């Protein structure tokens, strides 16, 4: 095997590692839930009153969202919340 082939293989493996490593770091935890589902409920900074759902660690719970800010643990329906966060 020539030096060019060895260098090509090393380059390919390096690029593969650089591309896949961040994906591995941000992958779902072992129980199948994403980091989003681990966030607390957060009604946001405004005073509107929108019905939303958040995952509380066990199930999806209704809360009032103020309309701006907050975090990503906020879903428009209980079904969407359960689909994303409930253990499979």
Swiss-Prot record:
InterPro entries: Kunitz_BPTI, Kunitz_BPTI_sf. Keywords: Disulfide bond, Protease inhibitor, Secreted, Serine protease inhibitor, Signal. SUPFAM superfamilies: BPTI-like (SSF57362). Residues 1-27 form the signal peptide. Residues 37-85 form the BPTI/Kunitz inhibitor domain. Gene3D superfamilies: Pancreatic trypsin inhibitor Kunitz domain (4.10.410.10). It holds the Pfam family Kunitz_BPTI. It is found in: Secreted. One of its GO terms (biological process) is envenomation resulting in negative regulation of voltage-gated potassium channel activity in another organism. The keyword Signal applies. Disulfide bonds join 37-85, 60-81. Residues 28-33 form a propeptide. One of its GO terms (cellular component) is extracellular region. The record marks 47-48 as: Reactive bond for trypsin. GO terms for molecular function: potassium channel regulator activity; serine-type endopeptidase inhibitor activity; toxin activity. It comes from the Eukaryota. Expressed by the venom gland. Serine protease inhibitor that inhibits trypsin at a molar ratio of 1:1. Belongs to the venom Kunitz-type family. 01 (intermediate) subfamily. This is Kunitz-type U15-theraphotoxin-Hhn1r.
């Amino acid at each position: 095997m020539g030096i060019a082939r060895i260098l090509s293989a090393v380059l390919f493996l390096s690029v593969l590692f650089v591309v896949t490593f961040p994906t591995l770091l941000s992958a779902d935890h072992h129980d199948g839930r994403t980091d989003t589902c681990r966030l607390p409920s957060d009604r946001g900074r405004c005073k509107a009153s929108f019905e939303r759902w958040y995952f509380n660690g066990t199930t999806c719970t209704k809360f009032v969202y103020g309309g701006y800010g907050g975090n990503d643990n906020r879903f428009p329906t209980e079904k969407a919340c359960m689909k994303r966060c409930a253990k499979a």
